[in-house]
């Protein structure tokens, strides 16, 4: 079967939910028996988001093969239940880097290198590569940004050309826009959508479907107006209303026959999507009977998207126990030894996620101490594991000034030190220990019980690691190293035996959690928090 290509663009404003729309369509097509892959094109000039501030970009999502990518890839993986790779997130920086390397090699035979055709050809190659390497029936490509952005123009030109390259029956364009509701006038306005589509058509792209984000139901006469002015069928104007849960969106789109419209346009002969299991999930999510309050102690809590996968993994674990998750976002800069009890009052569990830099470090350490001393269930991730080790060294072993060499290079007790292979690394971007690595679990530990396995594979993103010079004396005081690299050299999981639930991992377990298959450490953490 010829691979089909679907392009999802956005207009009017950003953050309309293009990623959720693309992921939801991917789930519907997968449930129709199609093999689906999905990718995101980001128009920024950074090679990847690895060195960008979370306030600029949200979380960095890490794939199995170690790519640092856009957070939308997390949505893709969770919705479609597939593992993506480095080719699933393409930036302008990657495109230009590749074009310039080819120019230096002489691949263009002395020609003048231009946006058209050289840059656009490189973009098209990344689209087609996704289909070739996965042997997918359908490739869904989300174009980041909004129509009209100067940065997006080469990407839009490239996807325009693809229709001519492979034929109209093999390409589909879905455009996401906004229909604002003006409270003062008491009416909805279609003009922004009309102008956005006009802009898109001026670039040579006629959308086949328009997905309109709206707070209120769109009247039939407005759908007719949009269809008329934008030259599409009325049934191809799809409503994307705010949902109680993200996981309801595929069902809302299916109810409006989006997957049927796509299959008809692309001449896809496939079964109807069986969404029985998905409907059961949504029904469960909307009717949770329990409640658990988790404190997430971090320094980027003003932007929850910085911890998006962590929050979703907590919710997935909650679904398994019929419990809603109430996340208390605690700014670690506000936590002190004097107010930690007040800051964490009434929580059932404490989570310290990953991060970099020294801001808010002492507040996180105080939160960990409080969890350890008050026997409150605790889960640490990446930096959270490192700080749990430092807290124990300071307050149980009495190693004054114990710290991480990342935060204090002159510490007398570098509990956390640079990985040996990192000592000569100068570049910051793309040089961390990234991606999927094995971890050997110790029998009789909380970690081994959670996974019910001997060797596990989890995704990593770090440059510093536990210093083995302190392993023996910390073990003597009850600090357990329950997971290590297969050769025993790198510490992967630590835990406390005399605590109801205290465990921390160097890896990022949140990246592999799924709504119907919660990650084991999160599952056990929520179960312990419910018991508290």
From Swiss-Prot:
Sites binding CTP sit at: 14, 149-151, 189-194, 225
**Protein keywords:** ATP-binding, Glutamine amidotransferase, Ligase, Magnesium, Metal-binding, Nucleotide-binding, Pyrimidine biosynthesis
> What pathway is this protein a component of?
Pyrimidine metabolism; CTP biosynthesis via de novo pathway; CTP from UDP: step 2/2
Q: Which reaction does it catalyse?
A: UTP + L-glutamine + ATP + H2O = CTP + L-glutamate + ADP + phosphate + 2 H(+); L-glutamine + H2O = L-glutamate + NH4(+); UTP + NH4(+) + ATP = CTP + ADP + phosphate + 2 H(+)
Q: Which residues bind UTP?
A: 14, 189-194, 225
Which PROSITE patterns does the UniProt record give? GATASE_TYPE_1 (PS51273)
**Under which main EC class is this enzyme filed?**
ligase
Annotated spans, Amidoligase domain: 1-268
Residue limits of the Glutamine amidotransferase type-1 domain? 293-532
UniProt keyword Transcription regulation present: no
List the GO terms this entry assigns under cellular component, sorted alphabetically.
cytosol
Entry binding sites for L-glutamine: 55, 355, 383-386, 406, 463
* UniProt-annotated binding residues for ATP: 15-20, 72, 241-243
Any single biological process term in GO: 'de novo' CTP biosynthetic process
What NCBIfam families does the entry give? PRK05380.1 (NF003792), PyrG (TIGR00337)
By its UniProt entry, which PANTHER family does this protein fall under? CTP SYNTHASE, CTP SYNTHASE-RELATED
Q: Reproduce the miscellaneous comment text.
A: CTPSs have evolved a hybrid strategy for distinguishing between UTP and CTP. The overlapping regions of the product feedback inhibitory and substrate sites recognize a common feature in both compounds, the triphosphate moiety. To differentiate isosteric substrate and product pyrimidine rings, an additional pocket far from the expected kinase/ligase catalytic site, specifically recognizes the cytosine and ribose portions of the product inhibitor.
Q: What protein name does the entry list? A: CTP synthase
Q: Which organism is it from?
A: Halalkalibacterium halodurans (strain ATCC BAA-125 / DSM 18197 / FERM 7344 / JCM 9153 / C-125)
Q: Source gene?
A: pyrG
């Amino acid at each position: 079967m010829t691979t089909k290509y679907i392009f999802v663009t956005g207009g009017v404003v950003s953050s309309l939910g293009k990623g959720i729309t693309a992921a939801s369509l991917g789930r519907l097509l997968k449930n129709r028996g199609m093999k689906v892959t999905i990718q995101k094109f980001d128009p920024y000039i950074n090679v990847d988001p690895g060195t960008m501030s979370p306030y600029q970009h949200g979380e960095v999502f890490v794939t199995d093969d170690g790519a640092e990518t856009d957070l939308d890839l997390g949505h893709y993986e969770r919705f479609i239940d597939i593992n993506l790779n480095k080719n699933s997130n393409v930036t302008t920086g990657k495109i230009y880097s590749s074009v310039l390397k080819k120019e230096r090699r002489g691949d263009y035979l002395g020609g003048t290198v231009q946006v058209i055709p050289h840059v656009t050809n490189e973009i098209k190659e990344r689209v087609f590569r996704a289909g070739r390497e996965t042997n997918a029936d359908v490739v869904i490509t989300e174009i980041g940004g909004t129509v009209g952005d100067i940065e997006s123009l080469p990407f839009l030109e490239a996807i325009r050309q693809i229709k001519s390259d492979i034929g109209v029956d093999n390409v589909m364009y879905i455009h996401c826009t906004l229909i604002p509701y003006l409270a003062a006038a008491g009416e909805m306005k279609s003009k922004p959508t009309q102008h956005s589509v006009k802009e898109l058509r001026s670039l040579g792209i006629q959308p086949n479907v328009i997905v309109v984000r709206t707070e209120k139901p769109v009247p039939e006469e407005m759908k007719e107006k949009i269809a008329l002015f934008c030259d599409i069928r009325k049934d191809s104007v799809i409503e994307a209303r705010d949902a109680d849960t993200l996981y309801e969106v595929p069902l809302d789109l299916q109810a409006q026959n989006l997957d049927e419209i796509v299959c008809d346009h692309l001449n896809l002969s496939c079964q109807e999507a069986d969404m029985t299991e998905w409907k059961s999930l949504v029904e469960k999510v909307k009717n949770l009977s329990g409640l658990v309050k988790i404190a997430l102690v971090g320094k980027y809590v003003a932007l929850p998207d910085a911890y998006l996968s962590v929050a979703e993994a907590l919710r997935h674990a909650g679904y398994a126990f019929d419990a809603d998750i109430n996340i208390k976002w605690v700014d670690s800069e506000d936590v002190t030894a004097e107010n930690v009890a007040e800051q964490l009052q009434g929580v059932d569990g404490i989570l310290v996620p990953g991060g970099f830099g020294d801001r808010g470090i002492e507040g996180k350490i105080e939160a960990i101490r409080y969890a350890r001393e008050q026997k409150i269930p605790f889960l640490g991730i990446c930096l959270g594991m490192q700080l749990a080790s430092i807290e124990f060294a300071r307050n149980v072993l009495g190693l004054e000034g114990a710290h991480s060499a990342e935060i204090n290079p002159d510490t007398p007790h570098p509990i956390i030190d640079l990985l040996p292979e990192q000592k000569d690394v100068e570049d910051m971007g793309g040089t961390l220990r990234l991606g999927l690595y094995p971890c050997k679990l110790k029998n009789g530990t909380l970690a081994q019980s959670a996974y019910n396995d001997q060797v596990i594979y989890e995704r990593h993103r770090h440059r510093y690691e536990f210093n083995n010079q302190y392993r023996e004396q910390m073990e003597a005081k009850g600090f357990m190293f329950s997971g290590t690299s297969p050769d025993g050299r790198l510490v992967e999981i630590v835990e406390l035996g005399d605590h109801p639930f205290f465990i921390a991992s160097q890896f990022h377990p949140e990246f592999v959690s799924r709504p119907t298959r919660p990650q084991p450490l999160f599952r056990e953490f929520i179960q312990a928090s419910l018991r508290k």
